[in-house]
Design a protein with these regions (language model features):
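Membrane-interface transmembrane helices that cradle and orient dolichyl/undecaprenyl
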Residues: 1, 109-114, 149-167, 175
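Transmembrane signal-anchor helices characteristic of membrane glycosylation enzymes that use polyprenol
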Residues: 7-36, 210-227
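Short helix- or helix-capping micro-motifs
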Residues: 15-18, 119-124, 172, 176
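Transmembrane-helix motifs of polytopic, lipid-linked glycan transferases
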Residues: 16, 90-110, 147-148, 152, ...
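Extracytosolic helix-loop segments that constitute the early lumenal/periplasmic catalytic or substrate-binding loops
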Residues: 21-25, 37-65, 69-72, 76, ...
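Transmembrane-lumen/periplasm boundary regions of multi-pass, lipid-linked membrane glycan transferases
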Residues: 40-49, 174, 183-291
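Transmembrane alpha-helices of multi-pass, membrane-embedded glycan-processing enzymes
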Residues: 66, 70, 74, 78, ...
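Short acidic/glycine- and proline-prone juxtamembrane loop motifs at membrane-interface regions
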Residues: 128-141
């Protein structure tokens, strides 16, 4: 078997088993609770009564809503399944399989075939990711669109293709509609990349267009806010100012975040064993120690 044939055979097996893990007995094990019922009713009204909407699911902050992208994304799956939530969940699971392929594609493009296959294998077979991918909820499609955004940023950095700044801005806007907390990752990352790689932007028009496209993804929420007497801004102001949500010091926040990231990252491979999680941390840190001169 030739090298490229073996590569694609391994990739096929990874994608096949990734799909199997995410779809097997989904009709029997799918969780359908209040949030899923609320979303299904809203999409039912869209499909049968043509009631369009400007906002999506509520966030973890009272009175603040996501954008409507998740509902419009689910609508075709509910239409094809005639209202069956299992079909909608299966559609999101296939997007998760698409994320496995994108990890392979990005890994191969950036670091080579072996890294691409290993990344796809770890993500596709991760217990945590498999469980997450079988969940009918708005954060579920986030990895797929995040990887698309990362691909656009990579094309901008490596191949000097300024148009991909516009595409990445649009995708980041969609990601924020799926999970507001992703802004903590996306906004600083994009700003740092734009400052760092500013000389690669062929024309200022791409930056302006990128900002306009990003704002365009926020227009439904902006219109909803002013249509309802500033309800979203009022809720955001209440969260930040009146309730004093950020009481911890900067060092306390950093410490808690690092512990959380460690727990989440290591838990994707070893959900329960503390000792094996330490092994993950050691393996992850080793390249930075061994190749610190090249890294920094």
């Amino acid at each position: 078997m030739k090298k490229f044939e073996f590569e694609y055979f391994i990739l096929f097996l990874i994608l096949l088993f990734s799909a199997f893990f995410r779809l097997f007995r989904l009709n029997l094990l799918l969780g359908f609770w209040y949030d899923q019922g609320r979303d299904a009713l809203i999409i039912w009204d869209l499909l049968h009564y043509h009631k369009f909407f400007l906002i999506g699911p509520v966030t973890g902050i009272d009175g603040i809503f996501l954008g409507p992208f998740y509902y419009y994304l689910l609508a075709p799956f509910y239409f094809l399944g005639r209202g069956n939530p299992v079909i909608a969940a299966a559609g999101l699971s296939w997007l998760a399989v698409g994320a496995v392929f994108l990890l392979y594609f990005l890994g191969k493009k950036m670091f080579g075939t072996q890294v691409g296959l290993m990344a796809a294998f770890l993500y596709g077979f991760s217990y945590g990711q498999v469980t997450f991918s079988r969940w009918l909820a708005n954060p579920n499609p986030l990895p797929f669109f995040t990887l698309l955004a990362l691909f656009c940023l990579y094309e901008f950095i490596e191949n000097h293709r300024s148009l991909f700044i516009v595409l990445s801005s649009f995708l980041v806007g969609l990601c924020l509609q799926l999970e507001a907390a992703s802004a903590v990752f996306f906004l600083p990352s994009v700003i740092v990349i734009l400052i760092w790689q500013r000389k690669r932007v062929s024309s200022i028009k791409y930056l302006v267009l990128g900002i306009l496209v990003f704002v365009l993804t926020l227009l439904p929420q902006i219109y909803f806010n002013f249509r309802h007497d500033g309800i979203l801004l009022s809720a955001f102001r209440k969260f930040l100012v009146e309730e004093k949500s950020f009481k911890l010091s900067f060092l306390q926040v950093v410490r808690l975040r690092l512990l959380t990231y460690y727990d989440v990252f290591a838990g994707k491979l070893f959900p329960q064993s503390g000792k094996l999680r330490l092994l993950v941390l050691a393996l992850f840190s080793a390249p930075f120690v061994l190749f610190r001169k090249k890294c920094f």
